[in-house]
């Protein structure tokens, strides 16, 4: 029997180390098929190797399918071609195993005569198995293919010849010796199989570990390469802003290069720093704009839905706006008005407010009731007014004129605040086409006010005009607003229902009409009734006490459930560009920086551009007003058509110092409508108010020297600095913190009412103004000094240059003198010689 030397397996010849990039591909390509192939073959052959020992002694029955009687049945198939296929299509692990199985079956059938050729047959199968494994190892590498083809040819020829010789000589031999040798070979092959399985497991583990290390090495190389490439890309991408670009020096430090001026510097340019500082703010502003747009869309949808809902609940007894005549709901009227701006509105219905319908009406539908009889005093000619239909009293569009109606003007003594006035009535026609009130009735009422005051009915309302500024971009604008100190006073467009017998609604309507129509000049004649109460000598005490009166009256009033009626629209049309919700930021105690005039004053109220200018003029003191319960020291001026006016205040910050003292629940949002025409008027008004406020500030500076604690020199300096500041700068200083129109609708003064209008705020603002002026003066002085220093440096340099030139001249002249003297001595010596 020919024994072929077994070729040792190639465990690790460095191929994977040389070809690390293809490790995963090769291992995945061959490892699984190789393991399955070897496992199947080892299991099949192990089963077949053990079978001849059991069946070989019983007449030569083999492990195959052929029995003893059909011993020669497989002979015709036992040619050499059935062992090894030369076609590459069938040369697969499965085809090889099938071929070997068939081979064993045929060979078992051929040896069925009991002559016992099985031992040699199985030892030969062991050799064949080793040879096939070697050939399979060779298949892994492409450079072995030609050699593999030659090996196959030689193997097939060897096998066919050897098997043919084996088969030919197998018929006549001793079976017992061959059977023993087959058993010995079976034992040896079983131990070899176990060793091979162990070697194969170790090899698989080693291959798996090598594959993992190769994969880690590949990943490390890939990450390092990617990192290097990214670093190079980052180096190629130089940061630029404007003309400046950022570079890295050889020492690794960043420097900045200007391509225009060709200047390099270590410091980051100023515009670069400003851009980095403003970048998050710009991003935040863009986000705010997106949020505002989303809120505006949601508010529009909400207003439409709430308007539909409020239309469905119109069956109560209160009178409402006739939207059919007025041009639709507030949002539609705003759009029809043609002055729709970016400021989003939100029509708050009664369903959206945290109140019940029983105590608060829908804000989209202003409510009112007829006024009851008003009792007059002994000298007041106590007349009574009958109930007045709301259709005649409500303000209408100029295109919808109404019939003339008697305007009931009732001013009486307020039960709170210590402000007592006489009550009187006067009738005057109010034409709906122009809404210009006739002043005669109100003059009569004012003349009757001086007749009787203390004994008038407490149920009539005391109206008070406080000069407050608009909260929008023109805080210098001073417009009159009506405040309520009486429980029976009801503001139009408030959330609280009007109790029966309330007075003063007509005068509130007239005031609103004046404000909305933007009259050129309010017809104020020389009929001023001044009720002086207590000491009126000190202007500062006058301002403080008027604040005290308002605050005390508002705190005792528990039925004022809303802020004032809307005063924000100074447009010539009466179209409500917003919903009729009271969007008010001030109450009767709006006393910001109190630039007080002397106590006897009149009010020349002009509405040129919506500005009320207060002039100090002698008023006619008169009237017999009784002393109030709170002991107020306030100066009051009864202006026809406007009610009694207490104090003059100019608001200089945009709503931060105007508070609304209201005990009822306010509306969820108090928005501001700055329409186009109103915005232009208020911008014009800001400049005029700035000039007025500057003059008033000078008066306040003269009256409050003990507060400013400044000597005459600094006061003169500060007053001279006013000329250095432009009117826009003054307006900016007057306005205080800037609030954009889009943010103004989120402002609610009632939320800060508890920290506003304190006495210390006046002093604080004056001190702040003084501090700002001082800083401005210091800046101007520093600028002047810096300029002088530069001039002085230039003079020093020019003087040094002149001195150097002078020294050069002196040296030159000395040198010339020396040469001349030498030449003179030489000439004298020569003359002596001659």
From Swiss-Prot:
Biased composition (Gly residues): 53-77, 109-119, 369-384
SMART domains attached to this UniProt entry: WW (SM00456)
GO CC list: lysosome; nucleus
PROSITE patterns assigned: WW_DOMAIN_1, WW_DOMAIN_2
The keyword Manganese is assigned to this record: no
Gene Ontology molecular function: chromatin binding; RNA polymerase II complex binding
Keywords: Autophagy, Chromatin regulator, Lysosome, Nucleus
Tissues with expression: Expressed in adult head and thorax and in larval central nervous system and fat body.
Domain WW: 244-271
Membrane spanning stretches: none
Gene3D superfamilies listed in its UniProt record: 2.20.70.10
CDD domains: WW
Low complexity bias locations: 22-31, 402-411, 431-466
The organism's place on the tree of life at top rank: Eukaryota
Region (Disordered): 1-247, 268-411, 430-504
InterPro entries: WAC, WW_dom, WW_dom_sf
Subcellular location: Nucleus; Lysosome
Compositional bias ranges of the Basic and acidic residues kind: 33-50, 96-108, 127-168, 181-246, 268-303
Pfam family, one: WW
UniProt record, GO biological process: autophagy; chromatin organization; habituation; negative regulation of autophagy; positive regulation of TORC1 signaling; regulation of autophagy
Disruption phenotype: Neurodegeneration, slow growth, decreased starvation-induced autophagy, increased basal autophagy and decreased mTor activity. RNAi-mediated knockdown in neurons results in impaired habituation during a light-off jump reflex habituation assay where flies are exposed to a series of sudden light-off pulses and measured each time for a jump response. Mutants fail to adapt their behavior and retain high average jump response throughout the experiment in contrast to controls which quickly habituate to the repeated light-off stimuli.
Known role: Acts as a linker between gene transcription and histone H2B monoubiquitination at 'Lys-118'. Regulates the cell-cycle checkpoint activation in response to DNA damage. Positive regulator of amino acid starvation-induced autophagy. Also acts as a negative regulator of basal autophagy. Positively regulates mTor activity. Promotes, in an energy-dependent manner, the assembly of the TTT complex and the RUVBL complex composed of pont and rept into the TTT-RUVBL complex. This leads to dimerization of the mTORC1 complex and its subsequent activation.
Name used for this protein in its record: WW domain-containing adapter protein with coiled-coil homolog
Organism for this UniProt entry: Drosophila melanogaster (Fruit fly)
């Amino acid at each position: 029997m020919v024994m072929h030397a077994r070729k040792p397996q190639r465990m690790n010849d460095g191929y994977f180390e040389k070809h690390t990039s293809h490790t995963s591909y090769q291992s995945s390509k061959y490892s699984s098929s190789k393991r399955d192939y070897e496992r199947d073959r080892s299991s099949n052959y192990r089963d077949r190797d053990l079978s001849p020992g059991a069946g070989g002694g019983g007449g030569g029955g083999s492990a195959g399918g052929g029995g003893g009687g059909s011993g020669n049945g497989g002979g015709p198939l036992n040619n050499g071609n059935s062992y090894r296929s030369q076609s590459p299509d069938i040369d697969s692990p499965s085809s090889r195993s099938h071929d070997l199985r068939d081979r064993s079956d045929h060979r078992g059938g051929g040896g069925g005569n009991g002559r016992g050729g099985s031992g040699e047959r199985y030892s030969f199968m062991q050799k064949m198995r080793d040879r096939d494994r070697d050939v399979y190892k060779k298949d892994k590498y492409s450079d072995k293919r030609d050699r593999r083809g030659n090996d196959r040819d030689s193997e097939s020829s060897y096998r066919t010849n050897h098997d043919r010789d084996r088969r030919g000589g197998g018929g006549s031999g001793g079976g017992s010796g061959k059977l023993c040798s087959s058993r010995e070979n079976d034992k040896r092959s079983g131990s070899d199989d176990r060793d091979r399985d162990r070697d194969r497991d170790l090899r698989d583990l080693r291959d798996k570990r090598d594959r993992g290390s190769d994969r880690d090495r590949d990943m490390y190389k890939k990450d390092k390469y990617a990192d290097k490439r990214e670093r190079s890309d980052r180096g190629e991408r130089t940061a630029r802003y404007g003309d400046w670009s950022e570079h890295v020096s050889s020492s690794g430090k960043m420097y900045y290069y200007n391509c225009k001026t060709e200047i390099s510097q270590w410091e980051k340019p100023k515009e670069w720093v400003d851009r980095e500082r403003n970048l998050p703010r710009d991003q935040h502003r863009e986000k705010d704009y997106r949020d505002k747009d989303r809120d505006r869309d949601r508010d529009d949808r909400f207003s439409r839905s709430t308007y539909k809902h409020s239309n469905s609940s119109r069956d109560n007894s209160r009178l409402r706006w006739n939207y059919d005549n007025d041009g639709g709901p507030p949002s539609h009227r705003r759009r029809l008005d043609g002055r729709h701006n970016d400021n989003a509105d939100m029509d708050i219905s009664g369903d959206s407010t945290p109140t019940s319908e029983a105590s608060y009406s829908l804000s989209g539908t202003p409510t009112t009731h007829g006024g009851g009889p008003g009792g007059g005093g002994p000298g007041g000619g106590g007349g009574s007014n009958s109930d007045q239909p709301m259709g005649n009293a409500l303000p209408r569009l100029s295109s919808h004129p109404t019939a003339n109606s008697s305007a009931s003007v009732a001013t009486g003594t307020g039960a709170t605040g210590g402000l007592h006035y006489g009550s009187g009535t006067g009738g005057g026609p109010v034409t709906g086409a122009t809404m210009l009130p006739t002043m005669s009735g109100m003059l009569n009422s004012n003349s009757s006010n001086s007749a009787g005051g203390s004994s008038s009915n407490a149920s009539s309302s005391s109206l008070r005009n406080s000069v407050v500024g608009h909260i929008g971009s023109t805080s210098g604008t001073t417009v009159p607003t009506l405040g309520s100190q009486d429980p029976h006073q009801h503001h139009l467009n408030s959330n609280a229902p009007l109790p029966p017998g309330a007075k003063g609604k007509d005068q509130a309507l007239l005031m609103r009409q004046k404000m909305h129509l933007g009259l050129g000049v309010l017809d104020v004649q020389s009929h001023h009734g001044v009720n002086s109460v207590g000491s009126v000598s000190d202007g500062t005490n006058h301002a403080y006490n008027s604040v005290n009166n308002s605050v005390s009256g508002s705190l005792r009033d528990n039925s004022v459930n809303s802020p004032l009626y809307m005063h924000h629209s100074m447009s010539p049309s009466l179209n409500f560009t917003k919903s009729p919700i009271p969007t008010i930021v001030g109450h009767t105690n709006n006393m910001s920086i109190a630039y007080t005039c002397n106590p006897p004053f009149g009010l020349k109220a002009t509405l040129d551009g919506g500005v009320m200018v207060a002039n100090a003029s002698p008023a006619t003191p008169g009237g017999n007003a009784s002393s109030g319960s709170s002991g107020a020291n306030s100066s009051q001026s009864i202006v026809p058509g406007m009610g009694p006016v207490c104090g003059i205040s100019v608001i200089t910050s945009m709503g931060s110092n105007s508070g609304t003292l209201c005990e009822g629940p306010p509306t969820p949002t108090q928005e501001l409508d700055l329409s186009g025409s109103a915005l232009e008027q208020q911008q014009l008004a800001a400049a005029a108010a700035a000039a007025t406020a500057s003059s008033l500030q000078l008066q306040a500076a003269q009256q409050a020297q003990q507060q400013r604690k400044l000597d005459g020199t600094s006061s003169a300096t500060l007053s001279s600095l006013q000329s250095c500041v432009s009117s826009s700068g003054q307006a900016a200083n007057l306005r205080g913190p800037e609030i954009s129109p889009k943010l103004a609708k989120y402002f609610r003064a009632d939320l800060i009412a508890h920290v506003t209008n304190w006495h210390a705020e006046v002093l604080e603002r004056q001190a702040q103004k003084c501090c700002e002026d001082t800083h401005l003066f210091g800046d101007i002085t520093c600028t002047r000094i810096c300029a002088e220093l530069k001039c002085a440096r230039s003079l020093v340099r020019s003087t040094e240059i002149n001195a150097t030139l002078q020294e050069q001249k002196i040296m030159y002249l000395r040198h010339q003198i020396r040469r001349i003297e030498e030449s003179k001595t030489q000439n004298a010596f020569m003359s002596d010689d001659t």
